Amino acid sequence: VVHNYQYGTLHRYIDERLNKGINVICDIDVQGFKLIQKTDIDHISIFIIPPSIKELEKRLLKRGLDSENVIGTRVENAKEELKCAEEFDYRVLNDNFEQAYEEIVSIIINGKLTKNNDKINIKILRDMLS
């Protein structure tokens, strides 16, 4: 349950695809990540970092999908989730869409992000949390 909504992907669904040699991409939160960590599923984890908390709030408002109360809850949850970002294999800053997209594709295809980019993303993350 996230933001009072229930989300999930059936383990069976993932297993069926993996057994057929099909890679599965899941858009999950930190709770989902921690559940996958407890399984034997071979995975790569990518944490998408917002440019700032203010920018995240601005983007949520611009979407126009949630009330201000829900947005406030989402922002507070994001602050907590950011504390877990360094547990993920990679961190990608979602400041420039095209660049973030290229980094994610590189991680998926090559299984790596340049160490320099990841160090920069970790610094941005730590600055945001301080």
What is the predicted function of each stretch?
Residues E16-N19, K38-I41, K83-A85:
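Conserved catalytic network of the ASCE P-loop NTPase/AAA+ motor domain
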Residues V24-D29, K38-R63, N94:
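Conserved phosphate-donor/acceptor-positioning beta-strand/loop module used by diverse small-molecule
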